[in-house]
């Protein structure tokens, strides 16, 4: 654990991890779908803990935050993050969002413009049609299949994630026990239910141009989950944006290309 941890469970039923460095603008880290704040950022947070303040939040149905079958969406997650930052007394911040986290980050930047100084979107998407999921019904069937699989073989998905981390040399030996335990704590049945309810219907194309924050978009040249052309749909709608592509990276940039990512974050945020 790279930083002090604070839970706001009594108020928001959300788990947060907060690190404070006096005189710095806090960076808010928003994780990917099916992960959590530590699972997504365990290779990033320890290396910047002396350079900047940060807050990492477990979003709904992920990590140590609450689990519920009630319908929720990206905008609700954005509202919760905004409320947490208000409770923490944060009036200006930088935000880093990966995949699903990038969707929440964009919503925050639209809803509360004075709050967001700079925005980093890693493998972002504006909607899940076109290049990736041309048939939403088919994706819903896929999500249903995965949910059934998780009930029959509850360890399958955590084992798959762990295998990927090991094969891609994303975790060193000292992290293996932690990674194994962390992955097996995920709320997979809830996570994949969310896929059908809020990931598929998400569509930000009509309002992305309202975002005013200076933005850095980071993509992976070999990303098969959110290909470059899908992220480019975000880029073309943003007003003030820079793009960095890691040619040999897939979707898991914070796991496989953490040093490249850290270089970009330090330069963009002037850490």
Identify the residue ranges that each predicted region occupies:
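Active-site loop/oxyanion-hole signature of alpha/beta-hydrolase fold enzymes
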Residues: 42, 55-96, 263
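Short beta-strand/loop motif that positions the catalytic acidic residue
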Residues: 211, 217-219, 223
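Conserved alpha/beta-hydrolase catalytic His-Asp/Glu region
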Residues: 130-132, 136, 151-209
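Conserved HGGG/HGGXW glycine-rich cap/lid loop of the alpha/beta-hydrolase fold
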Residues: 19-64
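Single conserved hydrophobic/aromatic residue that forms the stacking wall/gate
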Residues: 1-12
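Catalytic active-site module of serine/aspartate enzymes centered on a nucleophile-bearing elbow/loop
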Residues: 241-271
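Flexible "cap/lid" loop of the alpha/beta hydrolase fold
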Residues: 110, 118-149
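Gly/Ala-rich beta-loop-alpha elbow adjacent to hydrolase catalytic centers
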Residues: 97-101, 105
């Amino acid at each position: 654990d790279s930083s002090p941890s604070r839970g706001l469970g009594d108020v928001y039923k959300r788990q947060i991890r907060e690190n404070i460095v006096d005189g710095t603008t806090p960076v808010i880290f928003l994780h990917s779908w099916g992960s959590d704040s530590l699972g997504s950022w365990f290779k990033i947070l320890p290396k910047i803990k002396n350079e900047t303040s940060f807050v990492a939040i477990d979003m709904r149905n992920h990590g140590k935050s609450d689990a519920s079958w009630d319908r929720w969406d990206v905008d609700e997650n954005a509202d919760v993050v905004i409320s947490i930052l208000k409770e923490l007394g944060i009036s200006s911040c930088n935000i880093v969002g990966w995949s699903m986290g990038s969707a929440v980050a964009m919503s925050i930047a639209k809803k509360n413009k004075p709050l967001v100084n700079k925005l980093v979107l890693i493998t972002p998407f504006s909607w899940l049609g076109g290049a990736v999921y041309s048939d939403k019904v088919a994706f819903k069937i896929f999500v249903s299949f995965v949910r059934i699989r998780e009930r029959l073989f509850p360890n399958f998905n955590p084992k798959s994630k762990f295998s990927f981390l090991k094969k891609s040399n994303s975790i060193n030996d000292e992290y293996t026990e932690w990674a194994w335990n962390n992955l097996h704590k995920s709320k997979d049945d809830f996570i994949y239910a969310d896929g059908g309810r809020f990931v598929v219907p998400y569509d930000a194309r009509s309002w992305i141009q309202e975002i005013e924050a200076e933005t850095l978009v980071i993509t992976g040249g070999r990303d098969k989950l959110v290909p470059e052309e899908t992220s480019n749909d975000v880029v073309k709608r943003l007003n003030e944006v820079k793009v960095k592509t890691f040619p040999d990276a897939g979707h898991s940039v914070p796991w496989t290309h953490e040093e490249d990512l850290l270089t970009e974050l330090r330069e963009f945020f002037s850490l």
